[in-house]
């Protein structure tokens, strides 16, 4: 009988992203998307430091509009991942700027 291995760190991160999306999706109706209200709730709770540091009060509305690539007023999981990926890239860029320059191969 094959032994079932524990999830890797990457697999746990993916599971966590799915769980967080599902935690906020569906409160306003459709279970597979985030409405604008659900998106704002997610941003103000899960990304509170980012949200509070924004000087422009319209930034979240513009983010929602830009992320909503099919213009249905909802964010599906793929659109949600664009947000997560963009934030991860920005964090990675900041990290690279903060550490001493290293030769990349």
Swiss-Prot record:
Which residues carry the post-translational modification N-acetylmethionine, per the record? Answer: 1
Q: Which residues bind Ca(2+) 2?
A: 68, 70, 72, 74, 79
What's the domain of life for this entry? Answer: Eukaryota
GO function terms (MF aspect)? cadherin binding involved in cell-cell adhesion; calcium ion binding; calcium-dependent protein binding; protein homodimerization activity; S100 protein binding
Q: Which residues carry this modification: Phosphoserine?
A: 5-6
Positions bound to Ca(2+) 1? 33, 38
Question: Which SUPFAM superfamilies does this one have?
Answer: EF-hand (SSF47473)
Instruction: Give the Gene3D superfamilies listed for this entry.
Output: EF-hand
- Modifications the protein undergoes after translation, according to the UniProt entry: Phosphorylation at Thr-10 by PRKCA significantly suppresses homodimerization and promotes association with NCL/nucleolin which induces nuclear translocation.
- In which compartments does the protein localize? Cytoplasm; Nucleus
Q: Which residues carry this modification: N6-acetyllysine?
A: 3, 27
Please give the chief subcellular localization of this protein: cytoplasm
State the UniProt keywords alphabetically: Acetylation, Calcium, Cytoplasm, Disulfide bond, Metal-binding, Nucleus, Phosphoprotein, Repeat
Q: Which GO terms describe its biological process?
A: negative regulation of cell population proliferation; negative regulation of DNA replication; positive regulation of smooth muscle cell migration; signal transduction
Domain EF-hand positions: 13-49, 55-90
**N-acetylalanine found at:** 2
Q: Give Gene Ontology CC terms.
A: adherens junction; cytoplasm; extracellular exosome; extracellular region; extracellular space; nucleus; ruffle; secretory granule lumen
One Pfam assignment:
S_100
Positions of modified residues (Phosphothreonine): 10
What does the UniProt function comment say about this protein? Facilitates the differentiation and the cornification of keratinocytes.
Instruction: Describe its partners and assembly state.
Output: Homodimer; disulfide-linked.
UniProt protein name = Protein S100-A11
Taxonomic placement: Eukaryota, Metazoa, Chordata, Craniata, Vertebrata
This protein's encoding gene: S100A11
